[in-house]
């Protein structure tokens, strides 16, 4: 994905452009620039598709999601009230705050099924965004009971929430099959960022420490959410299109969430200007028609961190720190080869700086390396003893103060 954090990662996914090009850099900054971007939904709507979304938004006002190209909206990411304009029977309702009963991960999948049933004879695009696994951890007993035995309670909750998502995906697939749409539907399943381990993976009592470990894991990758290590940006990615993409294969080359927009726009027959999107159409690569790698290089910038990958080589920077890894030989990013291959590091550094010149603001970093990121680099990359990272301390901030701060930044609370 394009960032080790949810807001910029989702902005990149839905726009098909590096979010750094339009100034959505991290969760801590305003998402206002995203409003000027054309989303996948807006593009497909112009091509005659009906569009829908359900779940977490996190890209601005939850009552204005429809303005980003979504015809049918079911914003709900917790057991608190949500906002939607179609009910679970597929009937239009007045857009307003709603208080539907049931577990939010079940409800968003049910909404997706209702959307598919209603629009089975039309071309459609649906964006399902479960908040799972993610704090606050809130799986009900019907899911936690599937994972008995001794384990951290936060781990049990994460597995339970993933199980709920899995059930929902199963219901969606069953609905597609019921309406004979399975061979006409391309499905991507992608994580938005790596697991937030907070180094120590503290199993603090629930529901305390809402900004703490969410029970997910990154092994065997190094790092976590908030770093441009593989553990922060390398997430699960599944592509399914029965009869078109051969099943059971592991694609050997790197891809990125930006490719989703480029792929679906190409399949819809829409024309785009050169450079308008940053991804590529993956279908020729997944089918084997094109044997090359989809990308010569991939780049990232997240606040004071930046990285570039070219084949097996990855250059990672964090403030004044710099690392070079051979990901084929060292997928856990443990051996810094900067001194061994200075010529490779220079080539990658030059490409990264050229890429950064087109960002907003320009450059390979947009902020200073904060305390939390410094702790992560100390522990994951420099082998220093683990310090308690800043995010866990920041989670003690009073909720009212945190929500007011988030409102000023254009971030909806509890997302």
Where are these regions (language model features)?
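Formylglycine-dependent sulfatase
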Residues: 1-322, 329-350, 354-357, 361-367, ...
């Amino acid at each position: 994905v394009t960032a080790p954090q949810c807001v910029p990662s989702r902005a990149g996914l839905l726009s098909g452009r590096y979010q750094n090009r339009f100034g959505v850099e991290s969760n801590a900054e305003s998402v206002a620039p995203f409003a000027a971007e054309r989303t996948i939904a807006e593009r497909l709507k112009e091509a005659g598709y009906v569009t829908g979304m359900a779940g977490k938004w996190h890209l601005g006002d939850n009552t204005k999601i429809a303005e980003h190209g979504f015809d049918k909206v079911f914003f709900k990411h917790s057991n608190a009230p949500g906002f939607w304009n179609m009910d679970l029977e597929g009937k239009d309702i007045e857009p307003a705050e709603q208080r539907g009963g049931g577990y939010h991960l079940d409800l968003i999948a049910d909404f997706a099924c209702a959307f598919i049933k209603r629009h089975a004879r039309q071309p459609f695009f649906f964006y399902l965004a479960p908040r799972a696994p993610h704090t606050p951890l809130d799986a009900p007993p019907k899911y936690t009971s599937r994972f008995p035995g001794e384990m951290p309670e936060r781990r049990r909750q994460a597995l339970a929430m993933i199980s709920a998502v899995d059930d929902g995906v199963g219901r969606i697939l069953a609905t597609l099959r019921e309406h004979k749409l399975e061979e006409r539907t391309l499905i991507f399943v992608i994580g938005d960022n790596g697991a937030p381990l907070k180094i120590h993976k503290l199993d603090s009592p629930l529901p305390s420490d809402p900004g703490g470990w969410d029970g997910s894991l990154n092994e065997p990758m190094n790092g976590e959410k908030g770093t441009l290590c593989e553990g922060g940006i390398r997430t699960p990615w599944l592509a399914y299109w029965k009869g078109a993409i051969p099943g059971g294969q592991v694609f050997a080359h790197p891809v990125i969430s930006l490719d989703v927009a480029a792929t679906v726009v190409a399949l819809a027959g829409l024309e785009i200007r050169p450079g308008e999107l940053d991804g590529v159409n993956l279908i020729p690569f997944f089918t084997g028609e094109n044997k090359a790698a989809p990308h010569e290089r991939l780049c990232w910038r997240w606040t004071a961190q930046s990285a570039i990958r070219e084949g097996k080589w990855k250059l990672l920077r964090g403030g004044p720190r710099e690392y070079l890894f051979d990901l084929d030989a060292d997928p856990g990013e443990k051996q810094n080869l900067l001194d061994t291959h200075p010529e490779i590091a220079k080539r990658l550094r030059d490409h990264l700086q050229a890429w950064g010149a087109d960002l907003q603001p320009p450059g390979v970093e947009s902020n200073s390396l904060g305390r939390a990121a410094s702790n992560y680099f100390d522990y994951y990359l420099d082998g220093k003893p683990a310090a308690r990272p800043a995010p866990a301390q920041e989670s003690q901030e009073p909720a009212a103060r945190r929500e007011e701060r988030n409102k000023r930044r254009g971030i909806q609370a509890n997302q």
